[in-house]
Regions:
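Exposed beta-sheet edge and beta->alpha loop/turn motif
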Residues: 89-120
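Short, surface-exposed coil-to-beta transition loops
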Residues: 71-72, 108-113, 129
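Low-complexity, intrinsically disordered terminal/linker segments enriched in charged
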Residues: 125-145
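Extracellular/lumenal ectodomain signal focusing on beta-strand-rich modules
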Residues: 74-76, 115, 126
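A solvent-exposed, acidic/Ser-Thr-rich amphipathic alpha-helical stretch
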Residues: 28-84, 89-91
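Structural motif
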Residues: 38, 83, 115, 121-123
Protein backbone atom coordinates (compact mmCIF):
# COMPACT_ATOMS: atom_id res chain seq x y z
CA UNK A 1 0.00 0.00 0.00
CA UNK A 2 1.27 3.44 -0.91
CA UNK A 3 1.84 5.92 1.89
CA UNK A 4 0.30 9.40 1.83
CA UNK A 5 3.78 10.86 1.44
CA UNK A 6 4.47 8.66 -1.62
CA UNK A 7 1.05 9.63 -3.01
CA UNK A 8 1.87 13.33 -2.56
CA UNK A 9 5.25 12.92 -4.28
CA UNK A 10 3.48 11.24 -7.21
CA UNK A 11 0.95 14.11 -7.31
CA UNK A 12 3.75 16.65 -7.64
CA UNK A 13 5.48 14.68 -10.42
CA UNK A 14 2.15 14.51 -12.25
CA UNK A 15 1.71 18.26 -11.61
CA UNK A 16 5.07 18.85 -13.34
CA UNK A 17 3.76 16.89 -16.33
CA UNK A 18 0.57 18.98 -16.27
CA UNK A 19 2.35 22.34 -16.47
CA UNK A 20 4.94 21.25 -19.05
CA UNK A 21 2.81 19.18 -21.41
CA UNK A 22 1.99 20.72 -24.80
CA UNK A 23 -1.42 19.01 -25.24
CA UNK A 24 -4.04 21.38 -23.78
CA UNK A 25 -6.72 18.68 -23.48
CA UNK A 26 -4.32 16.45 -21.53
CA UNK A 27 -3.29 19.37 -19.31
CA UNK A 28 -6.94 20.11 -18.52
CA UNK A 29 -7.58 16.44 -17.70
CA UNK A 30 -4.65 16.41 -15.29
CA UNK A 31 -5.69 19.77 -13.80
CA UNK A 32 -9.14 18.39 -13.03
CA UNK A 33 -7.56 15.33 -11.41
CA UNK A 34 -4.91 17.22 -9.40
CA UNK A 35 -6.38 20.61 -8.42
CA UNK A 36 -9.45 21.20 -6.27
CA UNK A 37 -11.99 23.26 -8.23
CA UNK A 38 -12.27 25.81 -5.40
CA UNK A 39 -8.50 26.26 -4.94
CA UNK A 40 -7.62 29.98 -5.17
CA UNK A 41 -4.42 31.08 -6.88
CA UNK A 42 -3.12 34.60 -6.35
CA UNK A 43 -0.99 36.02 -9.14
CA UNK A 44 0.16 39.46 -10.29
CA UNK A 45 -1.41 38.81 -13.70
CA UNK A 46 -4.93 38.98 -12.26
CA UNK A 47 -6.45 41.44 -9.77
CA UNK A 48 -8.78 38.66 -8.57
CA UNK A 49 -7.85 35.14 -7.49
CA UNK A 50 -7.98 32.46 -10.18
CA UNK A 51 -9.73 29.23 -9.17
CA UNK A 52 -9.20 25.55 -9.77
CA UNK A 53 -7.17 23.77 -12.38
CA UNK A 54 -8.40 26.00 -15.20
CA UNK A 55 -7.35 29.08 -13.24
CA UNK A 56 -3.92 27.61 -12.64
CA UNK A 57 -3.55 26.63 -16.29
CA UNK A 58 -4.47 30.16 -17.40
CA UNK A 59 -1.17 31.28 -15.83
CA UNK A 60 0.68 28.46 -17.61
CA UNK A 61 -0.90 29.51 -20.93
CA UNK A 62 0.00 33.17 -20.35
CA UNK A 63 3.59 32.15 -19.67
CA UNK A 64 3.63 30.04 -22.83
CA UNK A 65 2.41 33.01 -24.92
CA UNK A 66 5.14 35.21 -23.44
CA UNK A 67 7.89 32.58 -23.35
CA UNK A 68 7.09 30.05 -26.10
CA UNK A 69 9.78 27.62 -24.92
CA UNK A 70 8.93 27.92 -21.20
CA UNK A 71 9.70 24.86 -19.09
CA UNK A 72 9.38 24.09 -15.41
CA UNK A 73 11.72 21.47 -13.98
CA UNK A 74 11.03 20.02 -10.56
CA UNK A 75 14.45 20.30 -8.92
CA UNK A 76 13.68 19.24 -5.36
CA UNK A 77 10.75 18.62 -3.06
CA UNK A 78 10.08 17.99 0.61
CA UNK A 79 6.75 16.31 1.22
CA UNK A 80 4.64 15.38 4.23
CA UNK A 81 1.04 14.18 4.63
CA UNK A 82 -0.47 17.64 3.97
CA UNK A 83 1.89 19.62 1.78
CA UNK A 84 4.78 19.66 -0.64
CA UNK A 85 7.52 22.28 -0.75
CA UNK A 86 8.83 22.31 -4.31
CA UNK A 87 11.78 24.06 -5.90
CA UNK A 88 11.30 24.65 -9.61
CA UNK A 89 13.72 25.82 -12.27
CA UNK A 90 11.84 27.92 -14.82
CA UNK A 91 13.52 28.61 -18.15
CA UNK A 92 12.36 30.35 -21.28
CA UNK A 93 12.94 33.02 -23.90
CA UNK A 94 10.93 36.25 -23.69
CA UNK A 95 9.51 36.20 -27.23
CA UNK A 96 5.95 37.45 -26.60
CA UNK A 97 4.29 40.32 -24.74
CA UNK A 98 4.48 39.83 -20.97
CA UNK A 99 2.58 42.11 -18.61
CA UNK A 100 2.82 44.96 -21.13
CA UNK A 101 6.51 44.39 -21.89
CA UNK A 102 7.29 43.80 -25.56
CA UNK A 103 9.49 40.79 -26.37
CA UNK A 104 13.14 41.32 -25.48
CA UNK A 105 14.56 38.01 -26.70
CA UNK A 106 16.18 37.60 -23.27
CA UNK A 107 16.56 34.12 -21.88
CA UNK A 108 15.48 33.68 -18.29
CA UNK A 109 16.44 31.02 -15.78
CA UNK A 110 14.74 31.43 -12.44
CA UNK A 111 14.57 29.36 -9.29
CA UNK A 112 11.03 29.37 -7.90
CA UNK A 113 9.66 27.86 -4.71
CA UNK A 114 6.06 26.92 -4.03
CA UNK A 115 4.23 25.28 -1.17
CA UNK A 116 1.32 23.12 -2.30
CA UNK A 117 -1.29 22.05 0.23
CA UNK A 118 -2.93 18.71 -0.57
CA UNK A 119 -6.28 17.59 0.85
CA UNK A 120 -7.27 14.07 1.95
CA UNK A 121 -8.71 13.43 -1.53
CA UNK A 122 -5.27 14.01 -3.07
CA UNK A 123 -6.07 17.38 -4.63
CA UNK A 124 -4.08 20.60 -4.37
CA UNK A 125 -6.26 23.16 -2.59
CA UNK A 126 -3.73 25.95 -2.00
CA UNK A 127 -0.50 27.14 -3.60
CA UNK A 128 1.74 29.62 -1.82
CA UNK A 129 4.51 30.96 -4.07
CA UNK A 130 7.76 32.53 -2.93
CA UNK A 131 9.42 35.31 -4.95
CA UNK A 132 9.20 33.51 -8.29
CA UNK A 133 7.39 36.21 -10.27
CA UNK A 134 9.91 38.85 -9.14
CA UNK A 135 12.63 36.59 -10.51
CA UNK A 136 10.92 36.73 -13.91
CA UNK A 137 10.12 40.46 -13.83
CA UNK A 138 13.61 41.62 -12.75
CA UNK A 139 15.64 40.47 -15.80
CA UNK A 140 12.98 41.88 -18.13
CA UNK A 141 13.27 45.32 -16.52
CA UNK A 142 9.69 45.27 -15.22
CA UNK A 143 10.75 45.96 -11.61
CA UNK A 144 13.61 47.98 -10.17
CA UNK A 145 14.45 45.60 -7.35
Amino acid sequence: MTSIIDRNKAIMKKFETMICHQDTAYQEKLAEELVDSSAPFLTPISPEPLYGGKGYLSVVYLMRKSFSDVQWKLVDMAVDEEKAAVTWELTGTHDGDFMGKKPTGKKIKVCVMNFYYINKDGKIYKDVAAEGMIGILRPLGLVNA
